[in-house]
Amino acid sequence: MLVIHTRIAPQAAADAELELTFEARRKSRLRCFTTAGEEVGLFLERGQPALADGEFLQAKDGRIVRVRAKAEPLLHVTCASPFELMRAAYHLGNRHVALQLGDGWLRLPDDYVLKAMLEQLGATVEAVQAPYQPEQGAYGGGHHHSHHGDEEFNYGPRLHQFGVRK
């Protein structure tokens, strides 16, 4: 089993690739397989942002592993005007839906209820299979509700590191 604990800076080449859905890339502990079929155990630091498409990891044996976002069922949303697209994003955000933002479009996980809502708002909604890389949000630490005695799970907010969008 390839055991991975470490995220590293971008590399020129990789020894293996992991192709993972967004939900899998959010996990700090995961059993998965490389694209070549080798078993992998991910043991990453908890409370960190999801693995991004193109991110690199280093296995305990020194091998370099590239992460690829796996195509998954999404809704691709466009609108007749920027205002209507902004309105659609507002209503999705009001429902705490993670969104991937593009120039003139939004993407979100396929959901028939949200699709119907978007169509009622006048949006054009198309089902697609594509890699999913939603925005991390302004605080990047996720959504937590700690209770008495759960202090070790109360991760404080961290300002998002805004990067260049592709």
Curated annotation (Swiss-Prot):
Gene Ontology cellular-component terms listed: cytoplasm
One Gene Ontology molecular-function label: unfolded protein binding
Region Disordered: start-end pairs: 135-156
One of the GO BP terms on file: urea metabolic process
Pfam families named in the record: UreE_C, UreE_N
Keywords assigned by UniProt, alphabetized: Chaperone, Cytoplasm, Nickel, Nickel insertion
Subcellular locations according to the entry: Cytoplasm
The keyword Glycosyltransferase is assigned to this record: no
InterPro entries per record: UreE, UreE_C_dom, UreE_N, UreE_N_sf
This protein's record includes keyword Acyltransferase: no
Similarity comment: Belongs to the UreE family.
Function: Involved in urease metallocenter assembly. Binds nickel. Probably functions as a nickel donor during metallocenter assembly.
NCBIfam families assigned to the protein according to its UniProt record, in alphabetical order: PRK13261.1-1, PRK13261.1-5
Entry protein name: Urease accessory protein UreE
Organism: Ectopseudomonas mendocina (strain ymp) (Pseudomonas mendocina)
